[in-house]
Each structure stands twice: as C-alpha cells, then as structure tokens.
Amino acid sequence: MQQKLETGIRQLGLDLPAEVTEKLLAYLALLAKWNKVHNLTAVRDPEDMVTLHLLDSLSVLPHVPSGSLLDVGSGAGLPGIVLAICRPDLQVTTIDAVQKKASFMRQAKAELQIDNLQVVAGRVEQFEPEAPFDTVISRAFSEIALFVKLTRHLMAEDGLWLAMKGQMPQEELGAVALKPAKIMSLIVPGLDAQRHLVFLPARQF
C-alpha cells in the first residue's frame, strides 16, 4: 500500500513529507479496521482504498484555497480528513448526518492528532457555525444545485464551492443555469474513470 500511495502521489505531482504519507496510511488502516464492523464504505480492499479514497481525494489538493473548509456529507472523512492531514494551513470541518461515520471521524482526529479538524454530526441544512467557510466541498453528496442550496448559508461572501464529480456534470449545471468559473478534468492514478472538479464562486449567486 505504501508504495502504491507514494507512486500515486508522485504521479499527481505532489510533494508530501514522509510523516504526512505515514499519517495517510494510518488513517487508511483505521478506516479498514472500522469498516469491518461498521460498514463505513463499500470499498473493502485496502489497495483499492488507496486509489478510490486517498488518491481520489489528493487529486483536488492543489486546487483548494487556504482558510476554512467545510466537507459536506464527508462519510468516513473523504476528502476532508485527507485534506486536513496534508494541509495544516486549512481549518477543516467535516459534517455527516450518520452518527457512526461522525464517530469514526472523531476517532481518527483523536488517534492521528489532527489538530486542524473539527467533526460535526448532523444535517448540513441545520448546521449553524460561528463563522462562514471560505470553501465548501463535496465528493458524493448530491446534485450540484442541491449542494449549493443546502450550504448557501454556510458560505463566505467571497467563498468557493468545489464539487467533485465523475463524468462531466453538464446536465446538472444546465438544469439550473449554473455557470461555473471552471470545470477541471482530474487524473487519478490507477483509476480508469472520469473525474471532474467544478469551481463555483459564491459571489455569482
């Protein structure tokens, strides 16, 4: 797993310290352990987890601004925990309505000592943080229009939505006349599938 992760990191053009790679592998080991009992993710094989969870999340790393970030429908902490581990400059909050997933994320925060991570258990539309977020990201939460609608109250005035998608989401964008600032095609090492990152600046809404 370590070699696969390190190779993938190089292919993504990232330069991560050894201690960050070690912490990512420790997170993956904890996820695999919990997954045997709590069924947090459908991906069971640790080698597949490297590609489908770690490298998929790491593919957006260069495109995330500094500041505060909210990961909506984070599940087991993807991409939020991965981003928090790699980017100490980010203040990351993850939120999920499923209690067992929030419990896992809290355990990961404690065991891995991720000081720049906060975990919230609850529905995003009912979440009332002390301050709005600079970036709101989702990986597999909902269609883009609903994602924006449910999180609008959480977004800073000059903030940015980042929607991680598979195929080009033209229908989602066209249905609600959303005009993204950019749609970037992402290459995930070892993954033979389309990945796109949609950039939606809050100031246009």
Curated annotation (Swiss-Prot):
Q: Which keywords describe this protein according to UniProt?
A: Cytoplasm, Methyltransferase, rRNA processing, S-adenosyl-L-methionine, Transferase
**Which compartments is it annotated to reside in?**
Cytoplasm
- Classification via InterPro entries: rRNA_ssu_MeTfrase_G, SAM-dependent_MTases_sf
Record GO terms (molecular function): rRNA (guanine-N7-)-methyltransferase activity
According to its UniProt record, the EC number is 2.1.1.170
Q: Which reaction does it catalyse?
A: guanosine(527) in 16S rRNA + S-adenosyl-L-methionine = N(7)-methylguanosine(527) in 16S rRNA + S-adenosyl-L-homocysteine
Q: What is its main location?
A: cytoplasm
GO cellular component terms, alphabetically, are: cytosol
Where does the chain bind S-adenosyl-L-methionine?
73, 78, 124-125, 139
Q: Which domain of life is it from?
A: Bacteria
Pfam (any one):
GidB
The family note in this entry says: Belongs to the methyltransferase superfamily. RNA methyltransferase RsmG family.
What PANTHER family does this protein's entry cite? S-ADENOSYL-L-METHIONINE-DEPENDENT METHYLTRANSFERASES SUPERFAMILY PROTEIN
Q: What does this protein do?
A: Specifically methylates the N7 position of guanine in position 527 of 16S rRNA.
Record NCBIfam families = rsmG_gidB
HAMAP family, alphabetically? 16SrRNA_methyltr_G (MF_00074)
Indicate what this protein is called per its UniProt record: Ribosomal RNA small subunit methyltransferase G
Species annotation: Methylobacillus flagellatus (strain ATCC 51484 / DSM 6875 / VKM B-1610 / KT)
Q: Which gene encodes it?
A: rsmG
